[in-house]
């Protein structure tokens, strides 16, 4: 308050000084005194403003300093915890160890100011950057083979992180920053394969990506295309290139199907081959391991639409499994808040509203039993038919019937042939029951679930400026043509 009064007084003084200076009421020495006083006042105000800014900056950066201090103290804490755990092994029972482990899992490090800014930057990379830059930013492994040639790879965890908002890249890894592994002998690739992520399902799709389960740039484009394209689009594309009508396509026809589907996706439209970084699409749009998986070792086999749709289903299952495991399930269950986070990950909801929705979930289901992967998978199977679900719920709405939990379960049984548990319905209604009357907010639910199904990959990879310029140019052309060639009456 004192600073504001001083600023006001100095301003008034400057105004009066200006008026008197122009009227010539003061002599020259008095003018000099007033000028010196005004200069001193301005200097004081500038110093005060600088102190205020320094204080505000220090308060804003306190979370960063606190976070760095926490990171420096983490190794010491780990050593102390190891020493304590060694002593506990000698003096306590296995039950005490389980309790200590559960308490350790409950501790969650608070996200600091720096991490929030980094995650916002990474979200912009996911939303607006080219596939080449996204791949180079989120890939973590660079392998130099026996010939000295280097190639960048993603692990399955990197792939999930590259398409999931608010998932921070590990420290010291970023754009063109990788863990480098050089060829050092015959067992080199065996060591690489031993380091790959372990999956719950032995028939995971990622095991078809060569013996190491790593994802090249061509595989990255192919997998994102498969994830972002509805099943119906693939069915139509296969029928278009199935000239003899036997329901099968060969390798050449499949390359044409890929090219057409990829050109319709936002990721494919943004891609440009970049020889400087080595991120160019190989012939066929996918790796030799995937083409071997589809067409056999001699590449002379046939691929049916049913086989390809099964590949798409298994890929969606594996990515969903990785997303589930990233939440560190306890006894095979994740919390209701984590399940809500999975549903809202690609919603585009403002962060403040998102936090409030998650807080409501945590408060309402404080002592709940959690959600299993089977329940999560059933709900996402229900979401695969989201367009039919939208139609069914619209019928209920137009008929004047309320969309309650029983209605949702009936729609799931009718449309998707799955049974939703009562607990999952409770969580969904807690998120999307805006007015608390026990009825679903249909429009918001369907809009968010459509974005969740495509994982945000269907959104245009630009900020709208190029589309605006293109529309203005088209309008100008049409207007000029109409002016030059007026319509005859």
From Swiss-Prot:
Location of region: Polybasic region: 106-117
Boundaries of the annotated transit peptide in chain numbering: 1-34
Localization (cell): Mitochondrion intermembrane space; Mitochondrion inner membrane
EF-hand domain location: 229-264, 371-386, 420-455
One annotated GO biological process: positive regulation of cristae formation
Compositionally biased region (Acidic residues): 81-101
Family named by the database record: Belongs to the MICU1 family. MICU1 subfamily.
Protein name per the record: Calcium uptake protein 1, mitochondrial
Gene from which the chain derives: micu1
């Amino acid at each position: 308050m004192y600073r504001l009064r001083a600023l006001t007084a100095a301003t008034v003084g400057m105004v009066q000084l200006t008026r008197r200076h122009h009227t010539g009421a003061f002599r020259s020495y008095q003018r000099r005194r007033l000028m010196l006083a005004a200069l001193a006042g301005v200097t004081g105000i500038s110093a005060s403003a600088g102190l205020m800014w320094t204080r505000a900056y220090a308060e804003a950066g306190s979370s960063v300093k606190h976070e760095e201090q926490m990171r420096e103290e983490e190794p010491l804490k780990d050593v102390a915890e190891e020493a304590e755990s060694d002593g506990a092994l000698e003096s306590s029972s296995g039950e005490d160890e389980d309790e200590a482990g559960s308490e350790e899992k409950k501790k969650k490090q608070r996200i600091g100011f720096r991490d929030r800014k980094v995650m916002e930057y990474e979200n912009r990379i996911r939303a607006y950057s080219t596939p080449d830059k996204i791949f180079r930013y989120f890939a973590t492994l660079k392998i130099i083979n026996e010939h000295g040639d280097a190639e960048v790879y993603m692990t399955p965890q990197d792939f999930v992180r590259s398409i999931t908002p608010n998932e921070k890249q590990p420290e010291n890894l970023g754009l063109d920053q990788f863990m480098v592994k050089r060829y050092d002998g015959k067992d080199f690739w065996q060591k690489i394969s031993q380091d790959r992520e372990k999956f719950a399902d032995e028939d995971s799709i990622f095991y078809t990506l060569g013996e190491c389960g790593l994802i090249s740039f061509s595989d990255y484009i192919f997998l994102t295309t498969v994830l972002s394209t509805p099943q119906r689009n693939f069915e139509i594309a296969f029928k278009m290139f199935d000239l003899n009508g036997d329901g099968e396509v060969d390798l050449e026809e499949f390359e044409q199907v890929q090219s057409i589907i990829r050109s319709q996706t936002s990721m494919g439209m943004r891609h440009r081959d970049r020889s400087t970084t080595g991120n160019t699409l190989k012939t066929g749009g996918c790796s030799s391991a995937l083409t071997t998986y589809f067409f056999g070792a001699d590449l002379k086999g046939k691929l049916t639409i049913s086989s390809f749709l099964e590949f798409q289903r298994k890929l969606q299952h594996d990515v969903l499994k990785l997303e589930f495991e990233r939440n560190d399930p306890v006894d095979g269950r994740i919390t209701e808040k984590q399940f809500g986070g999975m549903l809202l990950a690609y919603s585009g909801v403002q962060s403040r509203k998102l936090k409030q929705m998650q807080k409501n979930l945590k408060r309402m289901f404080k002592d709940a039993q959690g959600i299993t992967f089977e329940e999560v998978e059933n709900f996402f199977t229900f979401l695969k038919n989201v367009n039919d679900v939208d139609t069914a719920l619209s019928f209920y709405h137009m008929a004047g019937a309320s969309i309650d939990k029983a209605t949702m379960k009936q729609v799931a049984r009718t449309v998707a042939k799955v049974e939703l548990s009562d607990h999952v319905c409770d969580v969904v209604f807690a998120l999307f029951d805006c007015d608390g009357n026990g009825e679903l907010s249909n429009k918001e639910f369907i809009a968010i679930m459509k974005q969740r199904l495509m994982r945000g990959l269907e959104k245009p990879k630009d900020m709208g400026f190029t589309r605006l310029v293109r529309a203005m140019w088209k309008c100008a052309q049409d207007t000029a043509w109409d002016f030059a060639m007026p319509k005859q009456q």
